[in-house]
């Protein structure tokens, strides 16, 4: 089976699956209060919780809080789940082995 890579070097279908996962996390009626979005980089996708500004004088920008990172290793074809600590550093999640199926990681989040 041939795997198509996005411009980032990540499998396109897996990236689409992650984007769809994020969009489905919050019902439409609550999207003005909270959203789940993803930031796509060369070798990983970071899932973020987004909240609107809580004070008008802070501007219109929503606050982004990274909650998980899905890292892809092209050589092995495996996805690995990382969690973020209070110091903004990501650590490998030890309770889930890397998987060739990104859905395995999404099911665990």
Sequence positions of predicted segments:
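Generic preference for hydrophobic/aromatic residues in regular secondary structure cores
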Residues: 36-40, 67, 90
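Short, conserved beta-strand/beta-arch hydrophobic-aromatic motifs that form part
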Residues: 46-83
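Negatively charged, low-complexity tracts enriched in Asp/Glu with abundant Ser/Thr
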Residues: 1-60
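Short, compact, well-ordered microdomains
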Residues: 76-109
């Amino acid at each position: 089976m041939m795997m198509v890579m996005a411009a980032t070097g990540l499998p396109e279908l897996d990236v689409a699956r992650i984007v769809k996962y994020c969009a489905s996390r919050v019902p439409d009626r609550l999207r003005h209060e909270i959203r789940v979005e993803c930031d796509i980089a060369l070798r990983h996708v970071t899932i973020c919780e987004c909240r609107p500004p809580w004070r008008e004088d802070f501007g219109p920008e929503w606050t982004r809080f990274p909650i998980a990172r899905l890292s892809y290793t092209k050589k092995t074809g495996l996805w690995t789940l990382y969690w973020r600590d209070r110091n903004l550093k990501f650590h490998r999640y030890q309770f889930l082995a890397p998987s060739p199926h990104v859905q395995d990681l999404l099911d665990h989040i």
